[in-house]
Structure formats: structure tokens, C-alpha cells
């Protein structure tokens, strides 16, 4: 492990909330007291962005640590702050043709908001601003009636910011690449809380505090970095699909912990924190990783620990979920914000099966979330266990699940071709043949539509045609 540790808080929080965790790391003799550092950042400033935080963090890192490799623990929104910093630092070095370095050796993410929080939209409301101003001990006078608009838009499910950031650190040559030399590799680890705030007074006030598939704040499947990206390109309405090549680790350590929610997962005083299958059992192992082989071995331990936790969870928390994060654009890379995506089940003869279509709509399609500032980005979170059961039904019925996508443009002389894509054909494949369903993950789906322009928009003519009356 590195000699020094930096702890990064989440949205509307502050460093004072993390001193117990820092003291725990010192008590475990993982770091000396003087080598544990904390961050405070203005997450409730409406104008502050993740890039602002990343730039200042980079300056402070250079000033304090002077290029020394450090370890980082981050909570919730802090994960996006750190990932933005790492991406920003490397991209800057590339642009300026500077020497590459990797400032972070071990990155421990506690309940990270890697792919969204259902509370982020509420935080942008007037009620959210009042709460941030009058009921938050971390609020600042200069942020009066502010709640961090730019940060919260980045935190929303289906955030364009999350899409772009993922492109940097998961699908390009970045710090999570096992093929890099060892001192240019950052080893990330995901510690996800497995319980929400169900039954609490807060959950009675805010229903999303007890939303299934979440830890009361972030989506559990959205904490994982085991993300895949699929491009669906439609030329003349015909689909061509391609999985983006991955540069990151094939299996980033991920574990879900029973008995802990979004807030309590950072509290070492919690009984569930230190139990045999709790986070404490894996923190020291994560920090001891020195090579890609070590990392692979620890990833297996995370997986085993996660399954142990699922085995002792209550029925309300045991189901696993998956997110499908859609971005719709056209073949000239313009975002398509006005579109309708409809899932349909066809029977063996190719006709619509109304019963199975209704069953899919009732159980899955209602989970679509559209980003508040950019409707070209949408996400659907589905219960993986229910989805698997639905596909078993399709196999028995020899049915096919497809989606139809229709879209409009603001230009009357530009049209999009309506498209259809076969998601799963129960007559041809069994459930074991499903290639794009992975529990506790987010799958990015990049949909590219074919646009057609009329001659009224632009028309190339011959000389004779021009001279015709």
C-alpha cells in the first residue's frame, strides 16, 4: 500500500463525518495518523462542477504530495470527484506531451455514485435547496438556497457526465488498464451497501430512501465499474451491433454488504462493518494488492464475500438489478432527444403477444428514467432475477422480445427511419445464451439512428436542371 491516505466525502457532506474511518485505518496500523488526509469541497455550490473540483484537487495533490503515489477512500459522490480528477490529469498530460504518472495506487469506493442517485433530482427542487441551507451542518453561508445544481445533474441517473467519464476511464487507455506498467495502474475496489432505509421515518417522507435495488441513495448496480458498452447502429433501419473493446480490468472487485446502508457503510462502529463478511475483512486485502495477479485474486474474494452477504440478506434486499443506460444520437452525431422506445413481445408467428407485452411493461418498462437536462440520455433499471424469469417464459412460449424506436427532429425536412431490434428470441436461444445481461452492472447502449434529408433541405443539380424553367 501507499504510505499516505486521502479520504473524500460525498455530496452535502464534509470531512468531519469521516474522522472515525480515518481513525480506524490508523488503529489497524495501515497508516500513521499524520499520513491520513481529508478533503472538503463545495458540493452545494450551484455553479461548481466536477471539473472544478478535479482541477483544484490536482493542484493540492501536486502541492502536498509532490507526485508521491497515494491511496484514496471515497464515499458516494466522492467517487465521481476522484475519477474526474484521474481522467483530467491523464488527459492533460497527453495533451501537453508530459510524462505520464498515476497518482493513486489503491482506490477504495464506498457506496460510490458511479451511475446515479434517484435523490439527485429532488435535491434540485426548492425543497432540496431549503434542506441544504437550513438543515445541513455542512452548508456554507455563500451557498444560501443553493444545492449544487451542476453536481446534482451529474449525479442523476442517465447523466451525460457519467457517460463521458466512463468513456475516459473504462473504454480508453487509462489508469484501470491491466496492461499498463505497474506504476501507471490504479486498482479500484467497490464496497456497496446492500440495505436501504426501509422502515425508517426518513423513508416514509422520501419513498426513494426505500427504493428496491438501492442503498437508500445510490443504485447498487450503478456502483459497479464492471460496465460494458454496446453500440446499435441502424443503417436503412437494419441493426448492426458492436461491443466496444474494453481496456479496463475484466473484473473490478465488487461486493455488496448486508446490514449497511448508504450512510452506515463508512462507520466502523457498525456491527456489520466488522463482521466476518463485512467491509473490514476486505479493506486490508485490497490495500495489500501489488500486481494484476494480486488484484485478480482479491476480486474473487470480493465475489465470494458478496455471495455470502446475499445469503444472509432479508428477502427485501436479496434481488439483484441491472441498468441499461441509453444514449440516442444520429449518424452525424446529433443528440436525439425526442424519441419513444417501446418494448414488445411477439409470439411464434410474429404477431404481438398482448399478455406478455403487458407483463413486460408492468414489471420493467416503468423503470425508465429520463435525465432532467438531456432527454437523449435515459436509463432503465430492471430486477435481474425477474428479468431472467421472464426470459424463461419467453423460451417456453417461443416468444421474441423486441424494441421499436421512433424519433422526431425539429426540422421538417429531416426524418429518422423507425427501427426495430431483436433483444431476445426464445425460439432460437435458451437463457444461457443471453449475452448482455449481467447482474449488479450498468450496460451502456449507444443507439445511432439513420437520418434522411429531403431535397428541400439540400439538392445537387446538373447544369441542365438549373437552367430548366
Locate the predicted segments by residue.
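Serine-dependent carboxylesterase/thioesterase catalytic core
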Residues: 5-11, 36, 50-170, 200, ...
